[in-house]
């Protein structure tokens, strides 16, 4: 009877693994294990193959059996803990690490413990563990960058990642983290530089991943969630590219970024991709988008912005009852996932449906606080200009733009209360009070124009409409009829 040690089987298995045909190798190895349940070679290769197709639960089962059959081999205990960690079984992974008793594996053990604590959002414990590593260890710089980023220190995180890049050379995950840091700093051109490098290397080095073929209309099969795909950081890079295009209001570019990524079946999609698909296509496929976002909320982990985006999109599409239900059913998520601004805004918006006067008062309080903050930033900007401090000017301007967006959002929601009552004089009054901070904003100008038009103040309305129309001349198409 043939065994895994037989030359024919060994050559076949190793060729399949070399060609990255892990699923076929798994099929043969499972057949061998049915005949020889304690075969060390079969279990070891099977664990390796499962790990590479990211079936970490089955990989963990293989390595668990190996730790029982060969307790003297400390590497199996490490592989078992790594597989549990990758499967999201963090307490079990920590327990498995305690079984390790090898000075040679101590550094790897500390690094894995650090990753576990980071994923458990125990950042202080992760930092303490990380400090056990030598400061010149490239992984120290990489992981310290992650902790700095998590702490909101994006510039410091970026510097840490760039230092690690100099030592380690090109790594897709490291380049992605640098791009993410630049994205958080609103430096989109630099972020796109690193994203482009990830994508171009992926196209050049992994033609089997069918990058961009779906966008071109070519029918392609799923490439699966292999470890190779994970190591290229392509999915993360395309999602970040989509986010940047979305922020730049280039919806077509955002959609293409999602279809350019290596193709996978619906059930293979990760939570971030599902979230971005829902968000970017919400106007064309609202029902599908809401379904995806609601589904994500049921998962043990989901993108942090999912909860807020679902509530805001329900409100945007005037599904206020659904928004209220989601908020009530997930009250425990509000503190963790909603900023005070978003929570207050949603509370006022939902109040509009039953008590518009009370809602107006809530919006007015928010508007007053934002006005104070905008004036403070205006003063800081003037001081930075006098001091010719370019870095401070840049930071303050970014903060001002974000705050102005929030202010205009509150202002429009407040004005809509009177717009719905056709009290256009009151709407105009609200807009006039906000001219100090909004007179350069096209959204504000357009709504001012609308309310003037509704009051038959056509000449004044044209004064607001005309600059906006001229700005968008290139988008106008003419008919020959």
Describe every region a protein language model picked out.
Residues 42, 76, 109-110, 140, ...:
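TPR alpha-solenoid repeat register
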